[in-house]
């Protein structure tokens, strides 16, 4: 198993999309790329920790490649808006790829180059080495699955899931 750590707006959105993808074993919402140890949601939202809302994805590279995970990343958020996704504004919502190895860094840079051909504005996604990942509080985990009728889920997360479903990427079978 390998890991990928990505930030692209509210972690609930990326979590919900990647939980559907075949070859993904787990998705954990959390915080990374800041200077505060053991941050919590309130401190991250204050903008004082430097952390971004991120997801840490554990995946089977025999089923899905890191590069494919990045392709899904580009369709799951807008990488051309600095420190914002829709109405979510602040550095905690920045677009960021946190690589786990030199090979992931290389693939991230290649993926940005390729993705840039599909956007009219420049990609502002940061690429940094992952130093530490802090899982978010329990109530943030599996958010869409446990709160599907919540307004944010309906108006923000569901359209991202629908967009993913239209791509043709493999979707997990029921019960897997």
From Swiss-Prot:
GO MF term list: L-methionine:thioredoxin-disulfide S-oxidoreductase activity; peptide-methionine (S)-S-oxide reductase activity
Record field: catalytic activity: L-methionyl-[protein] + [thioredoxin]-disulfide + H2O = L-methionyl-(S)-S-oxide-[protein] + [thioredoxin]-dithiol; [thioredoxin]-disulfide + L-methionine + H2O = L-methionine (S)-S-oxide + [thioredoxin]-dithiol
Top EC class for this record: oxidoreductase
EC number: 1.8.4.11
Active site (UniProt): 10
Keywords, ordered alphabetically: Oxidoreductase
Record's keyword annotation contains Oxidoreductase: yes
Pfam families xref list: PMSR
Family the entry assigns: Belongs to the MsrA Met sulfoxide reductase family.
Function in brief: Has an important function as a repair enzyme for proteins that have been inactivated by oxidation. Catalyzes the reversible oxidation-reduction of methionine sulfoxide in proteins to methionine.
Protein name, UniProt field: Peptide methionine sulfoxide reductase MsrA
């Amino acid at each position: 198993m390998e890991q990928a750590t990505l930030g692209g707006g509210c972690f609930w959105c990326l979590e919900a999309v990647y939980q559907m993808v075949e070859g993904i074993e787990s998705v954990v919402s959390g915080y990374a790329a800041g200077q505060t140890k053991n941050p919590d949601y309130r401190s991250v939202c204050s903008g004082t920790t430097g952390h971004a809302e991120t997801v840490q994805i554990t995946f089977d590279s025999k089923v899905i490649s890191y590069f494919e995970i990045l392709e899904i990343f580009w369709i799951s958020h807008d990488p051309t808006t600095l420190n914002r996704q829709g109405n979510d504004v602040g550095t905690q919502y920045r677009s960021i790829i946190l690589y786990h190895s030199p090979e992931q860094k290389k693939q991230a840079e290649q993926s940005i180059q390729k993705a840039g051909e599909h956007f009219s504005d420049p990609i502002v996604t940061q690429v940094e080495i992952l130093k530490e990942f802090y899982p978010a509080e329990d109530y943030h985990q599996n958010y869409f699955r446990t709160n599907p009728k919540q307004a944010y889920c309906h108006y923000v997360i569901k359209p991202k899931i629908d967009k993913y479903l239209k791509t043709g990427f493999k979707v997990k079978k029921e019960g897997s």
